[in-house]
Amino acid sequence: YQSTNLPTMHPDDRILVAIMNSRRDWALVQDEGWYRLPTKHAPPDAPHFEWLAFYFTKVFKDDKWAIHYYARIEGHELVTRRDLIPSEPDHPRAGQWYYKLQIGPLEHKLPPIVSLRGRRVTFILTTGDRFMNALEINDLFEQESPAGQVYVRLKELGIPVEREWWIDEEGIAYVVDLALPIEDGWLPVTFGDRPSPAGGLRFAAEAEPDACMREVQARLPAT
């Protein structure tokens, strides 16, 4: 399900990165050219995106934790799961609503966009320019906010850092803007009113990146 006559991705195109954690669903993408997006969990602006990319989870073994394929979205329908998979009319979610995203030929992302650590990912919204230039999943997020600028500076210094990282604290899971691996776990960094775990760093939403960098570096082990 690939072609040499492929559409062009533009810098400001909107791209949805979706989680692919089922080989059966991937077979449907390859063989039938559509992907189902549950409306109750759909990200903002759904289904109005130009492109769909797929983040493979651990079920894909050697290809796990990476984006290897993407495709142009050519249309969408609002349907129930029963309409999509009529062979399972009694499935518990048979009556739930989905966007059926109809896609064009699959394109191979080379090199793939990888996650340097196995990570939990929900939907990621990004743009054409970020997608085409990204080498790792963290590069897909915006880089203009204070959090984005701090990420870029840390990366330029060769300091490992993750963006939009899930923290699980006593059974409660939430996302922090930045997370830096340290000897005894993670140093979480949040901006604005996002939850901040004990021992983490919190900055104002419009904090000065230079000041943030000084505080972050002060918390890191000396090298």
Predicted regions and their residues:
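Compositionally biased, intrinsically disordered low-complexity segments enriched in Pro/Arg/Gln/His
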Residues: 3-7
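Structured alpha/beta reader/binder surfaces that contact nucleic acids or chromatin modification marks
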Residues: 8-173, 181, 206, 210-214, ...
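Active-site beta-strand-loop-beta-strand hairpin of nuclease catalytic cores
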Residues: 173-197
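Residues at the C-termini of beta-strands that transition into short coil/loop
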Residues: 192, 204-207
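Active-site regions of enzymes building and remodeling cell-envelope glycoconjugates
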Residues: 197-204
